[in-house]
């Protein structure tokens, strides 16, 4: 039922968005001296790990229902991670300091891909 799918995604997304706000705000307030927005790096890295873990585990180890994938993958983790904030922050940093902006983009991508890789390994049960 399509309407139930939308509600499942919306409920997960609402939780993910609030979690992203809380985690990002907490990280950035604990480390106000940072030259880059660490909150976004943290949420994108953690979200990449858990989404990769979830999907690879669901495919290869423990089949998940469509509803669980919609809730956790599309909804919660989709809203928890934030590509739009990453691109906005990157452009803002590039305007201030091109080197800092590029470094931020590279660190964000490196951490997210590394976390996704470890999520894949653990999701497949290869550890």
UniProtKB/Swiss-Prot annotation:
The encoding gene is: fluC
GO molecular function terms attached to this record? fluoride channel activity; metal ion binding
Any one Pfam family here would be CRCB
What InterPro entries does the record point to?
FluC
Q: What is its main location?
A: membrane
Q: What are the alphabetically sorted keywords of the record?
A: Cell inner membrane, Cell membrane, Ion channel, Ion transport, Membrane, Metal-binding, Sodium, Transmembrane, Transmembrane helix, Transport
Q: What is this protein called?
A: Fluoride-specific ion channel FluC
Q: Name one GO cellular component term.
A: plasma membrane
Regulation (activators, inhibitors):
Na(+) is not transported, but it plays an essential structural role and its presence is essential for fluoride channel function.
Location of the protein in the cell: Cell inner membrane
Q: Which family does it belong to?
A: Belongs to the fluoride channel Fluc/FEX (TC 1.A.43) family.
Membrane topology reported for the UniProt record = Multi-pass membrane protein
Q: What does this protein do?
A: Fluoride-specific ion channel. Important for reducing fluoride concentration in the cell, thus reducing its toxicity.
Organism, scientific name: Thermotoga petrophila (strain ATCC BAA-488 / DSM 13995 / JCM 10881 / RKU-1)
- Reactions accelerated catalytically: fluoride(in) = fluoride(out)
- Residue ranges annotated as transmembrane are 4-24, 39-59, 68-88, 102-122
So where does Na(+) get bound? Answer: 78, 81
């Amino acid at each position: 039922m399509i309407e139930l799918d939308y509600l499942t995604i919306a409920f997960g997304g609402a939780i993910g968005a609030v979690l992203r706000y809380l985690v990002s705000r907490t990280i950035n307030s604990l480390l106000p001296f940072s030259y880059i927005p660490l909150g976004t790096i943290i949420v994108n890295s953690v979200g990449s790990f858990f989404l990769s873990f979830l999907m690879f585990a669901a495919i290869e180890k423990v089949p998940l229902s469509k509803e669980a994938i919609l809730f956790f993958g599309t909804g919660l983790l989709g809203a928890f991670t934030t590509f739009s904030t990453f691109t906005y922050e990157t452009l803002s940093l590039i305007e201030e300091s091109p080197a800092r902006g590029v470094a931020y983009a590279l660190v964000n991508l490196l951490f997210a891909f590394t976390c996704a890789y470890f999520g894949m390994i653990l999701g497949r049960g290869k550890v």
